[in-house]
């Protein structure tokens, strides 16, 4: 079982805040091995095996307690982060402008000595597949497992550097941002407080691609999970999600997250457009 518990501290359990009720897709049980089959981007939607079921949960507004959140306790935070990017659909501008911005953000928030930005995913809630982008993920999950976390380091770094880095602390953090000039109204992202996740609450899910197989954690339903979100995120905000931490000293090692339908959204909400950037943060 993964070791995910955070240390109990005076600020480890934030007070509960106003909430909405929404359905999120969990694994109901482990009667069927979870597997997700991913076609190339723009060619179709993923197909998944597993006994998934929608469960209604209370998702609390995290804005009133944003300053109390920590990557080492809850495993997600909200950061104020203005960007100079004009067009997030321009891959050259992403590489030239946004990657250095994200690298600086991760260093600022974690104190990491080196940050590697290695992947971007644009998600569009309105006809995302037709436009060659992915739709928001409606599944309670975490992007890495105990196995795939270290493997990502080996995949991305030269062999000698990878093995040296694996001997020290490293963290995998996703940076999630609204790329529209309007606040998010459709399919916001919800997060589970890491401290409310028990080891039995996650299952390994195989990710099948045309050229490789990976794995992530899928959430198994637990009524004790504490859910949060940041309503109406703007273009100058970024959510940081810790997806893997090599340290096993009591700090939070990862969280769970999923898109959901916010019942307070307008009747005809503006389609969500977002970018999720994956990073590796290394510490000396």
Predicted features and spans:
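Short, low-complexity, intrinsically disordered N-terminal peptides in bacterial proteins
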Residues: 1-7
């Amino acid at each position: 079982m993964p070791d995910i518990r955070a240390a109990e501290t005076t600020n480890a359990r934030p007070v509960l805040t106003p909430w909405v009720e929404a359905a999120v897709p969990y694994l109901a049980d482990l009667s069927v091995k979870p597997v997700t089959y991913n076609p190339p981007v723009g060619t179709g939607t993923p197909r998944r095996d597993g006994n998934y079921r929608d469960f209604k949960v209370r998702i609390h507004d995290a804005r009133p307690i944003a300053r109390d959140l920590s990557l080492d306790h809850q495993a997600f935070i909200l950061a104020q982060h203005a960007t100079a990017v004009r067009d997030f659909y321009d891959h050259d501008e992403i590489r030239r402008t946004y990657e250095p911005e994200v690298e600086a953000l991760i260093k600022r928030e974690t104190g990491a000595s080196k940050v590697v930005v290695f992947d971007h995913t644009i998600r569009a809630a309105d006809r995302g597949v037709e436009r060659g982008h992915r739709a928001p993920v409606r599944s309670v999950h975490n992007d890495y497992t105990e196995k795939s976390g270290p493997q990502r380091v080996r995949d991305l770094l030269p062999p000698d550097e990878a093995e040296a880095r694996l001997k020290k602390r490293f963290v995998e953090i996703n940076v999630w941002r609204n790329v529209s000039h309007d606040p998010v109204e459709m399919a916001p992202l919800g997060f589970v407080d890491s401290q409310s996740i028990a080891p039995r609450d996650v299952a390994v899910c195989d990710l099948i691609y045309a050229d490789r197989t990976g794995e992530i954690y899928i959430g198994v339903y637990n009524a004790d999970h504490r859910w949060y979100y940041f309503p109406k995120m703007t273009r100058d905000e970024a959510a940081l999600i810790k997806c893997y931490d090599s340290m096993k000293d009591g700090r939070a090692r990862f969280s769970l997250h999923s898109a959901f339908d916010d019942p307070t959204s307008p009747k005809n909400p503006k389609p969500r457009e977002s970018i999720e950037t994956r990073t590796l943060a290394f510490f000396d």
